[in-house]
């Protein structure tokens, strides 16, 4: 993939954010969002490559062929808007009211993509390479997006030295927090199958409910850990319990529950899955039925250790915002969990307080300030690593 010569072009991050928001790319739809982005990147001298898996559009773009390769990762897909009528401005109109940009994706995370593109436009000459890894499958099942692109790039021998993910990591003020790691996540669907019968004749039935209660009690009784350096304690939550029984005189045939564990690096997903399966087997001993657990690991816990890379980011954010960010591992999962397989990864973006909400919005000056922070990051990065 040969990059055209870098071109000096000025890009307004707010205008590009508006152009992206006007593409109604509700996951898994693309709605032309990738085309909009690709045109801008090609104008800046990037060699762009579409990587489609299933029905999902992904884009890998690179300017330069040498190392180090600094990558920006993000997603153009967005969550559904909910009730259109509840919005102050149309969710895909990208309207600016009193200095605030409204629209689905304004925070999560089309404005961050636009800000990094604008930053790159202001640094036309740099050593090494700059790349973009953009997916249309982050808000959905996340099976044909970043994870597949990472696997393909690794198989081809593509080297990414460091990555910035533009998720909205700031808590209250732009630049007050960056994420250097994330907890892992595992979901378990637990099913206990018994035998339906009349409550007056329990000997003719096999009640799955007490078995499910025993399983859930055992899972909740265990203290998974007391925390891990840089991480809060791992946590298990019961998210659903269902027997599908509306009668008061019927023992149900089956009982189901779902649990989620957010875990720190003290655990591996496979070990937690084995533990859940073991508790199911233990509770079902002597029961005239079966208890099973279907476990799915969404991602393992990871940490990018503080060092030269995080120092560059902290300095750049401080330069642009006047505040030194907290290095955090809080929050949910992101595509950083896949990128960690390629290189050290850190997340930094806008304040996330309105993401996924009606009236998702961001002050336009914060979009421009984020572009300035990204530009400072790019310059500091190549000064440190090239």
Swiss-Prot record:
Its cofactor is Zn(2+); Co(2+). InterPro entries: Bact_exopeptidase_dim_dom (IPR036264), DapE_proteobac (IPR005941), Peptidase_M20 (IPR002933), Peptidase_M20_dimer (IPR011650), Peptidase_M20A (IPR050072). GO terms for biological process: diaminopimelate biosynthetic process; L-arginine biosynthetic process; lysine biosynthetic process via diaminopimelate. The keyword Zinc applies. Pathway: Amino-acid biosynthesis; L-lysine biosynthesis via DAP pathway; LL-2,6-diaminopimelate from (S)-tetrahydrodipicolinate (succinylase route): step 3/3. Binds 2 Zn(2+) or Co(2+) ions per subunit. Zn(2+) 2 binds at residues 108, 139, 356. CDD domains: M20_DapE_proteobac (cd03891). Its EC number is 3.5.1.18. PANTHER family: ACETYLORNITHINE DEACETYLASE, N-ACETYL-L-CITRULLINE DEACETYLASE. Homodimer. This is Succinyl-diaminopimelate desuccinylase.
